[in-house]
Amino acid sequence: RVDRSVPLDANWLRAHPLPRHAHDIDKNARGKVLVVGGSRNVPGGVMLTAEAAFRAGAGKVTIATIASLAVPLGLAMPECGVVPLSETDGQIADGAPVVADLAEQHDVIVIGPAMDDADAADSLLAALLPSLSPAKPLLLDAAALRAAARH
C-alpha cells in the first residue's frame, strides 16, 4: 500500500501557488473537477467545495449529490453541472456506478464534502479506487476520509 497523501501546510502552499492562466485559455483547458457529496443535513457543503474548485482555477465543475439537492444547487450555481444521485434518508444511496462513469470524464475527483454516511462513502471508494489512475488527483473529505481507512 502506497501512501499518496501530502500534508497541505503553509510551506507547501507557498511552494505551490494557485496557477496563473493565460488570458486566451478557455475553460476546457483549465481542467474538470468532480465533487461528490452532500446530504440533507449539510446542503451547502458541496457548493462551498465547488466554489473553491473554481477559485483554484478549475474550468468546469460537476457536482454529484443527492437528488433532492440537485435542482436547488443547479439554481444556486448555474456555472456547475449537477448530477442527481439516488438517496435514502437524505444521504447518497447507490451512487457508485454513476460516480465511476463521471470520474472517467474529470481530471480531479473530490469525494465526501458534506457527507455524513460512512457506508455510502465506503461504497463510493470501493467502486472508484480499483479503476482510478494513480495519476488522477483524488481529494477525500468528511465521511470519505474516515472510510478510506478501510481500503
Where are these regions (language model features)?
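Small-residue (G/A/S/T)-rich helix-start motifs and N-terminal tracts that mark the onset
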Residues: R1-H151
